[in-house]
Amino acid sequence: MENTTTNPDVLERFLRYVQINTQSEDANCDQVPSSAVQFDLANVLAEELRELGAEDAHVTEHAYVCAHIPASAGAEDKPALGLIAHLDTTEVAPGAGVKPHIVHYEGGDLVCGTVDGKPVAMSTAKLPALNDLAGEDLVCSDGTTLLGADDKAGVAEIMSLVARIAQDPSLPHPALGICFCPDEEIGHGAELLDIDTFGCKYAYTVDGGPIGELEWECFNAAEATVCFEGQSIHPGDAKGRMVNAGNLFCDFNALLPYVQRPEYTEGYEGFYHLEGVSATVDHATARYIVRDHDAAKFQQKLDLIDAAASMLNQRLGEERVTVEIK
């Protein structure tokens, strides 16, 4: 869903971009981009940037789209400003075959489409932001896929700005660095962005919520992958011998403070977020993301993960729990 109170160029670009599948794939998170389809949008954007006068627009081997726009006359001495958005969409729902359409919303439940003859709707109870959008035209998917507003809305906004500057180069602006990066949804984002070549003293990520919202700081972030090695024994002969990796995970997870989960935190409060777990008796893997604005508290959270693993290994008398933090 995306508010369409905007200029026609932004809307046209947005409707086009969301139809290009760019889902990242967490299973391939050891490579960038994690999915080849992200190159499809990257190449489109680079070509459009060149057509708009960004002669250096290019796509790197890792699917980063980078370009520069010269400053307007009289603003050459101003600090360069970066504008960043991400190409990929999340894999939590289907992302291919997006069919965007515009719904005029008058309040109440927002019906996006139908699936198997049943309406797909969002209620104001689950999405209170809808209360501020009555009377607006909203872009929705047909209910069978993601829409992809995160972050193709940001991509469209940046591209529309570049087009506006191309039409009127006298519009006051500093030198601009443009970057569209892959794999933000799986925690990589700007990881392989060449900051020196990007050449911007300041940068903003165009990826947010309500119109007019501005965030001027960011959290510290890490990903922790915790592996648990079990030992499978027939349940009838398991006493003193079986080590159930699934139960080890449960014990580990219980050692992390539940009040520091996303559903119990807000504002500057940091959290541990369990993103996924797979478990059998023999082996279990859990993946957490850790966030905190305070660097000291952030490090304490990482230390607690290591301490929890050490505690379980000490109890077991051998190393069966390992932690990798990125």
Feature map (PLM): residue ranges:
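A non-catalytic alpha/beta surface segment that caps or lines the substrate-entry region
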Residues: C29-K78, G82-I84, D88, K99
